[in-house]
């Protein structure tokens, strides 16, 4: 029987104001929660690992300029190739028509995009376009400009970035003998600090060895010059010796805004950017120079303002020895007056992806909030931030049509994979446009989740979600529990479908996710609450969630496991070391165990100089790193532990897993390592994903899982 998508019950017609009351950013209320007492039994079968290849991954939402059509891409996993088949579809945004699969001469197409006149453009050998209302009509061949860059609104200029000539160094010439032996060398050599980049060959190229680049504008061939403009074919507008990001045009084609890192060649400093502008006559203006990290510059449609986002720069935090990070805000500067204001100074979440309204009166943006992503806006005249979309849900990939009539997004829940939705700009009149997994819903009963709001040990409100085991019946319990911790740590768990979690639930496990302190979407104080002590308060938040779940559901406190990847892997290692009598099994993925060894061997380890107050050779920082390292407490671990790691992980080096594995084996604790060949920090590929899930499930089943035969599992005296 098909499960019902609950999102249709959420009213979206009201725009509410942020900043006060229970709907405020960063505010969680702790109600006296009442949980269901009756649990209807599933009518479909449980999810199986073989179902993995039946789930379609939704990608690349794009709405047409007039808001009438939506194109999206599907990636269908293929077991035989370890790859995907990619499909492009188009659907009417009003929900009046079924989605249409776009093919070109029977073949799949690529790179969908919308033209200004509302045609759907795609690549199939060459570039073509079709009328979305009639995809079967003969496609029209589209010409492709050979000029790369950003055209000005008046069509007269193309703005681009041009590398400056490199100054050749004068090195001593080698003798013939030296040349022969240099040619025989097999290995790597480097003398730059940032020699690692996860997923890149080792060593990564020296980023400071790149040439400076400048902004150049080139006259479009055949372009009509503005009245009275006598100009050369090309102009170099800047001579900063920096490496600017892609410039954006002022609506009157007279100014370009861009960002650039003023310290880009200093390898000891951390990347950040300031905001600049330059006129087509080369007049330069710098808007920021305060140590913050700025981005996303955009001019208002009426040409009066420039907006940009910004947050504390890493060097700024480090040099001031701050005990917290900073906010991320949205700024507005008047081009006439040169005055900058912070539009979100009194708002406690992190705006991203800002977009101007056509009337220049509002800026729309996305932000995480309480396990979801929502659309917000703020008036350019100031005032409170307004929340547009609402509900216990996450609006992913939000797109706004060029005419600002329609928003589109993907939406999924714990028990429902993502589908495409559209709504009016104010969030009202929501339409579901796709139904991608009907066959699965008709056959498989997926487990639903319960939202938990509970106090941590010090009373701090924490949000989490508990996924029920398939066929849950309290009288048949107690059931084992798998606790999943998210990565980051400055990220969040939340609303959305997760195949692995559903697989655990289908095999008789509760699955708990918590947004512990350091998670995003709950305000700055919450986000930075673990500063200098990763694992302490956030670990308590996870443990309090376990206690809360056990108190309210039929969970066996003697059969609890921890799992997670990256920071979630660290958290797993931390929990089993600091709360050894609470866990019987664990599966940390790419988890740090030793902050000292991580410092010099990982590609971003040095950024932790902020949250650990320094480097390993500084006494206070070293003390904190040792204190917060799971390896320090390895002698306490009792949980049978499966270490998952990529062979060439440069974000959390494989040696981190080795250190903890050796410690556990030396202490007689069951442990196993699975290392994925050629894999970096994110272990990719369908074969690897399936293999990993199979082995994690086997490990948990072996040490604490339900056994239909009633026989003892290895956690009661055997080995898996």
Kindly label every feature range from the protein language model.
Residues 28-31, 85-86, 160-230, 234, ...:
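Predominantly five- to eight-bladed beta-propeller fold
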Residues 60-62, 201-215, 245-248, 255-257, ...:
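Non-catalytic accessory segments flanking enzyme active sites
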Residues 62-69, 111-120, 149-157, 247-256, ...:
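Blade-terminus and WD-like Trp-Asp/Gly-His loop motifs, strongest in beta-propeller folds
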Residues 71-78, 121-126, 160-165, 204-209, ...:
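Beta-strand C-termini and the immediately following turn/loop, strongest in propeller blades
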Residues 92-96, 131-135, 220-223, 279-282, ...:
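Short loop/turn segments that connect beta-strands within beta-propeller blades
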Residues 97-119, 124:
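Blade-loop segments of beta-propeller domains
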Residues 318, 436-558, 565-566, 600-604:
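Cap/lid segment of the alpha/beta-hydrolase catalytic domain
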Residues 506, 513-720:
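Active-site-proximal cap/loop segments of hydrolase catalytic domains
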